[in-house]
Amino acid sequence: MNTMEIRYHRLHQAMQERELDAVYVNAPENHLYMSHFDNPDGYLLISADESFVFADFRYTEAAKENVFPCCIVKEPGKPVLSELVAEKGWRRIGYEDESLTCAALAGLQKKMPEVEFVPTGDMFAQIRCAKTEDEIENIVAAQRIAEGAFQHILSVIRYDMTETEVAAELEYYMKKNGSEKPSFDTICVSGSNSSRPHGVPLPVQLEKGFLTMDYGAMVNGYHSDMTRTICIGKADEEMKKVYSTVLAAQQAAIEAARPGMRNAELDKVARDIIDAAGYGACFGHSLGHGVGPVSYTHRTLPTN
């Protein structure tokens, strides 16, 4: 089976387990994952033996060129959807409760009162967990672009640059070198702002001290997520201690990782080192997380 056939096989198995006649897919990452088509204002309807792409006039031409074999429905309005569901006789339809709004669900239920809409929870997240070889290649390609951006910024960064200029330089390099778009809003914070893990870049000159950059590239819909911290000016002893502690924790976790290990066990390997150095209260994040069609998958390395 090719990659798309594997995805549909997994989805059909999950649908069978939940006794679903069809699944209504509206989350952009899952729409792209199941169709090879980026359709931000449309949706998919997938049954055990058929798939339908609902796209308006802005996207139908692109859909014909890019979409995985599906029936393309040019009118995405609810009457067309309800007519199709009635024609097929579907009575249990799964929906993505993590992305479909309450208002949208209420609209579907009003148009199709005879249908039971069933929340799918993390069904798609579970399906996306196991990666095929070509998926891994896309993630690696995205990461290589991000790594190239880091090397690039080291070669061009200046004291008189602003946080927003550094962020823009990272994004420009990634776009120029094959990234479809940033994985998420690029973070670039310096000096006193560098303590904010998800701080917003400001049009202010770089401060001396730490400069933290958190960014990612996207290749064929697959994301990378990379964080790097450098020092503007000369690092003091405390900065060197922090750096050495984090590096030691990372290396210990990499060396300890093995198949079958519980996520919490691996997290503890790194966390114990950081705790022993006196920085335990500053380690609020989990040790790591997965990447794929989204930049932060539900597969994390938590403390429990």
Walk through the language-model features, giving the residues of each.
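Active-site neighborhoods and metal-handling regions in enzymes and metal-associated proteins
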Residues: 1-299
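A short, hydrophobic C-terminal helix/tail in secreted or cell-surface proteins
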Residues: 300-304
